[in-house]
Amino acid sequence: MLLDTASLYFRAYFGVPDSVKAPDGTPVNAVRGLLDFIDRLVKDHRPEHLVACMDADWRPHWRVELIPSYKAHRVAEERPAGPDAEEVPDTLSPQVPVIEAVLDALGIARVGVAGYEADDVIGTYTARATGPVDIVTGDRDLYQLVDDARGVRVLYPVKGVGTLNLVDEAALREKYGVDGAGYADLALLRGDPSDGLPGVPGIGEKTAAKLLAEFGDLAGIQAAVDDPKARLTPTQRKRLTEAGPYLAVAPKVVRVAADVPLPDTGTALPHGPRDAAALEALAARWGLGGSLQRLLTTLTA
């Protein structure tokens, strides 16, 4: 089981009231919400392996070089020497180090790789997996990894982190008209304002799905642009031609990496805390109470 950690603690932050606080009055709603969510995941699915995948770089330079608008609207501060600072709510930022410390003390593998997003870490673990994979994320970008034949599915939280939608190929075909392999092509054609991806002007989700159904994939659509007999309207042909420079680079930006140099880290689900003393201190300092105890009880069951 692979957790898209940042997307989940964002969901927890907005789904749990900020009246949930540590003894000193510091909000810990994201911390406790995430712990409660992991507890439910482990109870319901009992994964053999669990990895909290992290954004070591939420906006990698190699993606920005190709599409400068990529996530540009979410930059709080540009940092030439390292990853740009991301806009994060003031009361969430201080909770992230607490989340990391608690995961480490629990013994839950926490993996981020310099120069890559959590999506890329997830993509690489998925590519290497020899058995079924559940990807838990609030980011639809990872729908591209869904693969029934390999047992790869997405568990997508709705209503904060209270409910999970199971996304398999049937769900993708019903909602988007594509399978997992086609989702990245659909996304780059249609664009995604939340990630600063412009898409092809005038090609929305339904048109993109129709083009993929007709021509198979992005390469097939691009070949059709140069084929006067292909069933494209003059407007579609014009728009796709004008978007040629974008379409040449967008796949590398949109498709998650599958070749990240992952660390040699144990990923087995822990059955007891790695550092009980550190965990006890964190629980007392941050008032993690029932949330942490419930998760510990579940892990040791």
From Swiss-Prot:
Pfam families xrefs: 5_3_exonuc (PF01367), 5_3_exonuc_N (PF02739)
Cross-referenced InterPro entries: 5-3_exonucl_a-hlix_arch_N, 5-3_exonuclease, 5-3_exonuclease_C_sf, DNA_polI_H3TH, FEN, HhH2, PIN-like_dom_sf
UniProt-listed SUPFAM superfamilies: 5' to 3' exonuclease, C-terminal subdomain, PIN domain-like
Protein EC: 3.1.11.-
GO biological process, one term: DNA replication, Okazaki fragment processing
Keyword Nuclease belongs to the record: yes
Gene3D superfamilies per UniProt: 5' to 3' exonuclease, C-terminal subdomain (1.10.150.20), 5'-nuclease (3.40.50.1010)
Coiled coil ranges: none
One of the record's GO molecular function terms: 5'-flap endonuclease activity
Highest taxon of the lineage: Bacteria
rRNA-binding in keyword set: no
Residue span, 5'-3' exonuclease domain: 182-264
Keywords from the named record: DNA-binding, Exonuclease, Hydrolase, Nuclease
Membrane spanning residue stretches: none
Matching PANTHER family: 5'-3' EXONUCLEASE FAMILY PROTEIN, FLAP ENDONUCLEASE XNI
Entry function: 5'-3' exonuclease acting preferentially on double-stranded DNA.
Protein name: 5'-3' exonuclease
Higher taxonomy: Bacteria, Bacillati, Actinomycetota, Actinomycetes, Kitasatosporales
